[in-house]
């Protein structure tokens, strides 16, 4: 959306980046654009972040979905993204590798937003991983006061899919149940 809204600016910059990095593919160039856009957007939110002492004014950046099975790759990217600006919160998936990454990233000072969480069990498990990461930080005397971890239970996404399936298969589901 941001690139479409400022197409004149970003089309030129993306072309320049592609020329500057001839060995990089579209994906790497795309992630570099994400980083640049994120830094700019985070800067716009900094006054809110400062006013609310780190509790509001955060910008979410999604980790690369292709890393979903690699704990270390998710941790590395989460740490990298968190260092782009003080008010970054990093989205990480509630997968087996993601949950381990969430604990480690939290320990390293990354504020996380857990995504791909569709069940209460996932929410509890990721909440426990966040707590372990925070406790490890505190045990070493590291600050946790401005960290703002979030677990997003994505029930709405599941409801959207169930509505599509119900329409496709001509199933009647009481609207009160979706």
Please describe what each predicted stretch is:
Residues 4-7, 71-75, 100-107, 124-129, ...:
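Short acidic, glycine/serine/threonine-rich loops at helix termini
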Residues 1, 63, 71, 95, ...:
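Residue-identity detector for threonine
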Residues 56-60, 87-91, 109-113, 146-152:
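Structural preference for beta-strand elements that scaffold enzyme active sites
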Residues 2-101:
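Active-site beta->alpha loop and helix N-cap motifs at the rims of alpha/beta catalytic domains
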Residues 92-122:
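Basic (Lys/Arg-enriched) interaction patch that binds polyanionic ligands
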């Amino acid at each position: 959306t941001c690139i479409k809204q400022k197409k004149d600016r970003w089309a030129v910059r993306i072309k320049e980046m592609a020329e500057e990095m001839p060995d990089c593919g579209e994906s790497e160039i795309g992630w570099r654009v994400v980083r640049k856009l994120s830094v700019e957007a985070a800067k716009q939110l900094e006054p809110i972040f400062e006013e609310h002492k780190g509790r509001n004014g955060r910008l979410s950046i999604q980790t690369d979905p292709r890393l979903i099975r690699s704990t270390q790759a998710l941790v590395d990217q989460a740490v990298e993204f968190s260092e782009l600006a003080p008010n970054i919160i990093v989205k990480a998936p509630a997968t087996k590798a993601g949950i381990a990454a969430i604990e480690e990233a939290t320990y390293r000072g990354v504020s996380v937003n857990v995504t791909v969480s569709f069940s209460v069990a996932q929410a509890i498990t990721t909440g426990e991983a966040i707590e372990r990461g925070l406790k490890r930080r505190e045990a070493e005397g590291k600050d946790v006061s401005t960290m703002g971890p979030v677990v997003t239970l994505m029930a709405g996404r599941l409801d959207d899919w169930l509505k599509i399936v119900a329409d496709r298969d001509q199933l009647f589901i009481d609207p009160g149940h979706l």
